[in-house]
Amino acid sequence: MNVFEELFSVLAGGRVLDAATGEGGFIRVLHKHLNNYTEIVGIDCSGRMIINAQRKNKNHKVHFVQMNAGQIGFKEASFDTVSIAVSLHHLENVRQVLGEMKRVLKPGGKFIICEMHRDGMTEAQFNAIRIHHWAAEVDAALGTLHDRTFAQAEILDYVDELELYDVITREIQGINTDPLDDKTITSVGGYVEKYLQRAGQISSGEMFIQRGEELRRSLHEKGVQREPLLVVIGQKP
């Protein structure tokens, strides 16, 4: 039994909001592992992401809306479950988004946070973090918000501020995969290539390009594994 199955299979999701949903990847996790749910609504500020999410998630109980998670356009206490996954480090104001999610969550409802962190990594996981941080710096240089990965303690500080009860935390290490798996190397290598092209758009971007080329070499020498994930579930008072 994996961590998601362990935690989610006992949950009746009811009406679910997935904030900063991107292309709806975490919604597919919820759909697979929740005991049941009546509806899942995914919101994201990017229209392109919403279009991709709709294309990748063909389910009559799953809907997508273009919406800023910092100003959620739903009534107070209108969802039974809220979730946000691998998105905190993309947010301009983490507290505002989490506060909005708590506002639309019903009392007693479940608040789910799943976020990568940078603690206790293998060398291959460290490669993933280095690539992620480099890409974040390239995005920042081009005016796109993309912050560095949080430490686990920083994530838990945000959770503490929400004042949830019956909080459960689990960690997914992500080290049960071959760091030199050809498919993974090809996929991550494509990500690096995309950001090398973006780095070429930066005035005086030679430093970014040099670092990207070093990361590409390290990727093929040492491999890559997914960063550790912290999964948190709590209830709103």
Predicted segments, located by residue:
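Conserved Class I S-adenosyl-L-methionine
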Residues: Y165-P237
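Conserved class I S-adenosyl-L-methionine
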Residues: I112-A136
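Conserved alpha-helix/loop element of class I SAM-dependent methyltransferases that forms part
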Residues: M1-G14, V29
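A short glycine-rich, Lys/Arg-flanked "PGG" loop and its adjoining helix->strand segment in the class I
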Residues: R95-P107
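Class I SAM-dependent methyltransferase SAM/SAH-binding core
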Residues: L17-A19, E23-Q71
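A conserved beta-strand element that flanks and buttresses the S-adenosyl-L-methionine
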Residues: S83
